[in-house]
Amino acid sequence: MCMGRMISIINIILFYFFLWVKKSISELLSSTQYVCDFYFNPLTNVKPTVVGSSEIYEEVGCTINNPTLGDHIVLICPKKNNGDFSNIEIVPTNCFESHLYSAYKNDSSAYHLEKLDIDKKYAINSSFSDFYLKILVIPNEYKSHKTIYCRCDNSKTEKNIPGQDKILKGKLGLVKIILRNQYNNIIELEKTKPIIHNKKDTYKYDIKLKESDILMFYMKEETIVESGNCEEILNTKINLLSNNNVVIKMPSIFINNINCMLSSQDQNNEKNYINLKADKTKHIDGCDFTKPKGKGIYKNGFIINDIPNEEERICTVHLWNKKNQTIAGIKCPYKLIPPYCFKHVLYEKEIDSQKTYKTFLLSDVLDTPNIEYYGNNKEGMYMLALPTKPEKTNKIRCICEQGGKKAVMELHIASTSTKYISMFLIFFLIVIFYMYVSI
C-alpha cells in the first residue's frame, strides 16, 4: 500500500516536472497551453459524485476555440483501477491520433489524424501508473474547418450507497477542439524573390508585414540564426516542429514602427538576411480619459475631470463586431480598477440574487488563454488583442478614477454564436416571408 502510494507521489512529481519543462519550452517558443485535467484538478476531475439512481452522469470538460500554430492541447485522464475509476475509458482509445467528430459517438466512429490533414508526430502520448497524458500540437499549416472531440469517460463507473436510494456515479470529461482555417495570410520566404548580393551564396529578403501575418521559411540543419533589433515585436508565436520549417506569427498590434533583421548561416556558409518591416498600428478603438473624444490616442473617450463630482460616465467599445475589431485600449494615468486591467477585469455576476461587478481574470471570463496584452505603465496606457473570436458574448469593465470621479470603460465582446444566431434569424424571416406570400 505504501509502495503504491509512493509510486503515485513520484508520478505526480514527474508529471508536474514534465509540465514545468514543457512550460519553459513553450514560453521560449511563445506557444499557449490548454490543459484539460480530468484527474488532478478538483473542479474538472471525473471522480464519482452522489446522484439520484435515475439521474444521468454529470459532464465536465473544456472547449478550445481556434488554437493557433504551435499551441499545446493537453488531456490528462485517470487509468482504470478498482476504486473510483473502475469502468473509465478514453474514447477514442488512441486520442489524439484519432478523434471523434461527434461528442457522443463510440470508438468505432473515430477518424484518423490523416482525415484531419495533420501528421502523427503532432500527437504525443505518455503513460504514468495512475493516468494518461496526451498532447496535441497544432501544426504550422491547417486549412480545414472542423470540430473534434475526445472523451475521458467515467460515466459507467457506479457504486451503491448502503441504505440510500442514491448512488455514486462517475462523470464524463469532454474535450472539444474547434479548428478553423486561419492561415490565409502566410508569407512563404521560398516564394519571395530575394535580392542577390554580390557575394556568393548570400541572399537578402525585404518583407513588409501586417498585423497577424505569418512568416514561414525553411531552415537547414545546423543553422545559426541571429536577431538584430527585433525585440520590439511583442507577442510573436514561433513554431519549429515541422520538418525544419520555421513559422513566426506576428502579433495583432505593432507598438512601434518595425525595422529589424534576421540573419542565418548554415553549415555550407549559405547566408540569408531577412529584413522585416512593419508600420505602427493605427486607429485603435478604446477610451482615452485625458483628451476629448477623437483627440486622444484612442478613438473614444473624454476628459475625466469634466465629469461632475461623485458621478460616473461610460465609454463603450466593441470587439469582434461586424468590423471584426480585435484590439482595444485604455489610457488612464490615474487610479485604475482593477489595477492590472486588462489581465484582471470587472465582470458582472449574480451573488445572493444581486447582480454585482467582481474582479476576474479575463482568461477565465472568456475561457481562453489566447489573449495578447500590451502596456506602458509610465503613460498609463494598456491594450489587449483577441486573435480568436470567443464562443460566448461577454461584457467587461475597467474603471479610471480621479478625485472621486469615475470614467468607466465598458468592453462588449461579440462571440461566434452571434453569427449563427444572425443566420438563423435571416433564415426564419425568409420562411415567414414565403409563408405570408403564399397565403
From Swiss-Prot:
What Pfam families would the database entry show? s48_45
Q: Subcellular location, in the record's words?
A: Cell surface; Cell membrane
Without the gene, what phenotype results? Answer: Reduced parasite survival in the mosquito. Parasites produce normal numbers of oocysts when included in the blood meal of the mosquito vector.
Q: Which residues form the 6-Cys domain?
A: 32-182, 283-415
Give UniProt keywords alphabetically: Cell membrane, Disulfide bond, Glycoprotein, GPI-anchor, Lipoprotein, Malaria, Membrane, Repeat, Signal
Q: Which gene encodes it?
A: PFS47
Q: List all annotated glycosylation positions.
A: N106, N125, N324
Looking up InterPro entries in the UniProt record yields: 6_CYS_dom (IPR010884), 6_CYS_dom_sf (IPR038160)
Residues with a covalently attached lipid (GPI-anchor amidated serine): S415
Propeptide residues according to the Swiss-Prot or TrEMBL record: 416-439
Cystine bridges? C36-C62, C77-C152, C95-C150, C287-C315, C332-C400, C341-C398
Name assigned to this protein: Female gametocyte surface protein P47
Membrane topology per the entry is: Lipid-anchor; GPI-anchor
**Which GO cellular component does the record give, naming just one?**
side of membrane
Signal peptide annotation: 1-26
Q: Where are the transmembrane segments?
A: none
Query: Principal localization?
Result: other
Q: What does this protein do?
A: Mediates evasion of the mosquito innate immune response by suppressing midgut nitration responses that are critical to activate the mosquito complement system. It is unclear whether the protein has a role in passive evasion by making the parasite invisible to the mosquito immune system, acts as a decoy to prevent recognition of another surface protein or anchors the decoy protein. Not required for female fertility.
Q: Name one GO biological process term.
A: symbiont-mediated perturbation of host cellular process
Species this chain originates from: Plasmodium falciparum (isolate 3D7)
Task: Tell me what else is known.
Answer: Exhibits a high rate of non-synonymous polymorphism is different strains, suggesting that it adapts to different Anopheles vector species.
